Amino acid sequence: MSAFIVLGAQWGDEGKGKMTDYLAENADVVVRFQGGNNAGHTVVVGEKEYKLHLIPSGILYNDKLNVIGNGVVLDPKALFEEINYLESLGVEITPDRLIISDRAHVIMPYHRILDGIKERARGNKDIGTTGKGIGPSYTDKMERSGIRVCDLIHKEVFEENLKETLEVKNKIITEIFGGEALDYNEIYNEYLGYAEKLRPFVKDISVIVNKKIKDGKEVLFEGAQGTLLDIDYGTYPYVTSSSTIAGGVCIGAGVGPTAITNAVGIAKAYTTRVGKGPFPTELLDSTGDWVREKGHEFGVTTGRARRCGWLDLVILKTSARISGLTSFAVTKIDTLAGLDTLKVCTGYRLNGEIIDYVPASLEDLAKCEPIYEEFEGWDDSIANARCYEDLPENAIKYLKKIEDFTETKVSIVSVGPKRDQTMMISEI
């Protein structure tokens, strides 16, 4: 195994940060390839808890190279706030440990402003954006009007690009939405300061990452969000603005598909999502409330309560197919301890037909009735399991169902938030 992917197999919040931290122990390089500081990863090391948004989870190891790829949209203000936060917890961050793609696009103040304005303008049709400027930054990237990191650190290029872009953005903000114009000098001076601080970290990451792979180093690609939030294969428009699936690695980190050897899908033992959109297995009762409280299902980035539901194997099967997953890592199976009976969705009934895939149409997905199979539960002793044989028999049956239905093995099981509560039960 030389280069492998860790990505979310549901609607995000599956425990990718913890799994990346666990797998990073044997990696040499950890690469973020998409998204921005809208992501939220929580990693527990000993008695310390770290909340990461932009910087790869490998930063918690002293001997790893961490990479922010060109597919990421970078908010310099958020980056340096996160660096200061980590350094306050004793994590050293230097250009030897963190590098940033010169091709990554930069989130500007007008992106955050427009994100909020447009979301409010949607009224009850809002899509649940985090308001961090992610979508507008990706929009500028596709419209070829964005500012990249390599532009930002070249003063003359940045000056010219900012003048041209801000003139257009201010017209949109003031004339269309009735907002206040942004001040050029204020933005220019603020971002010049960021440019100087960024400069030592900026590299052509594609060259470096490919050389690491060629030299036989272990490279881990860390995804953000989840498969059902992918811009193409997610529950559009209630999605993020980037490609969250395995194919996004090639574009977002500048590596070829033949370089990737394995892809691990991270899946909770139940299902959650934040914000609006269809959710076939959602629990709108006391069981859903119980799972939310026991699983601490509140967003790291937004603090919003997550919607909770039964495990949806249709979603996992779809994720395995789209990303060519070689295995699953199942997290938070301990959260379900104490329930006498569990349900697992094994298909949807749509217009009288049974299907085992996620339909593209939101209207169709909203009409899907979940078909359930019931399983007997297990008790809280599962949190003490440290190997596969320690797991309760009913939990093993539950995991076996995931494998059989998705035709994808379960390689890792997590029974709690700490590093030592993770067990590898087969090769990934």
UniProtKB/Swiss-Prot annotation:
Residue numbers binding Mg(2+): D13, G40
Any coiled-coil regions, as ranges: none
Annotated substrate binding sites: V300, T301, T302, G303, R304, A305, R306
One cellular component term from this protein's GO annotations in UniProt: cytoplasm
Cofactor note: Binds 1 Mg(2+) ion per subunit.
Active site annotation, chain numbering: D13 (proton acceptor), H41 (proton donor)
Cofactor(s) named in the record: Mg(2+)
Keywords from the UniProt entry: Cytoplasm, GTP-binding, Ligase, Magnesium, Metal-binding, Nucleotide-binding, Purine biosynthesis
Top enzyme class: ligase
Positions that bind GTP: 12-18, 40-42, 306, 332-334, 414-416
EC number from the UniProt entry: 6.3.4.4
Disulfide bonds: none
Primary location group: cytoplasm
Gene Ontology MF terms: adenylosuccinate synthase activity; GTP binding; magnesium ion binding
Single biological process term from Gene Ontology: IMP metabolic process
Pfam families reported for this sequence: Adenylsucc_synt (PF00709)
Residues annotated to bind IMP: D13, E14, G15, K16, N38, A39, G40, H41, T130, R144, Q225, T240, R304
Family the entry assigns: Belongs to the adenylosuccinate synthetase family.
HAMAP family: Adenylosucc_synth (MF_00011)
Assembly notes: Homodimer.
Function: Plays an important role in the de novo pathway of purine nucleotide biosynthesis. Catalyzes the first committed step in the biosynthesis of AMP from IMP.
Official protein name in the record: Adenylosuccinate synthetase
Native source organism of the sequence: Clostridium botulinum (strain Kyoto / Type A2)
